[in-house]
């Protein structure tokens, strides 16, 4: 399983973000998942970038539609104690700890552009792409 965070997905969509080409990450048979939080984070990132003029008006809906087409399963059952423990151990936000907890629980890889989350995932033995 590939767990994707909002920074990775935004990197696929926004100019100059330096994200990996999704075609190199997405294996046809590999399921993709994210915590439920991705739904709000992605939309917020896109709207803020629209407001700042980084992306044209009207692109937000098209970008969301494209991401929804990837079939990302949104997880709604995180381990509360596990998330808190990861946040404390690695000094992560609870938001970032949600992504790491899902990757650990699913025994999956994690796609992120966030340096702190990358370090925490590597420390926990999670492969980062």
Can you say where each PLM-predicted feature lies in the sequence?
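N-terminal active-site wall of soluble small-molecule enzyme domains
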Residues: 97
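Acidic catalytic patch
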Residues: 36-39, 59-90, 101
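Short, well-structured N-terminal submotif of metal-dependent ribonuclease cores
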Residues: 1-37, 49-62, 124
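Short glycine/serine- and small hydrophobic-enriched flexible loop segments
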Residues: 44-51, 104
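Acidic, PIN/NYN-like endoribonuclease modules and their adjacent C-terminal/linker elements
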Residues: 1, 39, 92, 100-129
């Amino acid at each position: 399983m590939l767990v994707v965070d909002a920074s990775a997905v935004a990197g696929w969509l926004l100019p100059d973000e330096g994200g990996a080409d999704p075609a190199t990450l997405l294996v046809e048979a590999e399921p993709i998942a994210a915590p439920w939080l991705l739904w709000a984070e992605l939309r917020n990132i896109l709207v803020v970038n629209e407001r700042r003029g980084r992306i044209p008006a009207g692109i937000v809906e098209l970008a969301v539609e494209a991401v929804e087409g990837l079939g990302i399963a949104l997880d709604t059952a995180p381990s509360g104690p596990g998330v808190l423990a990861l946040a404390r151990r690695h000094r992560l936000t609870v938001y970032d700890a949600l992504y790491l907890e899902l990757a650990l629980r699913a025994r999956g890889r994690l796609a992120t552009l966030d340096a702190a989350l990358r370090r925490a995932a590597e420390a926990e033995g999670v492969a980062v792409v």
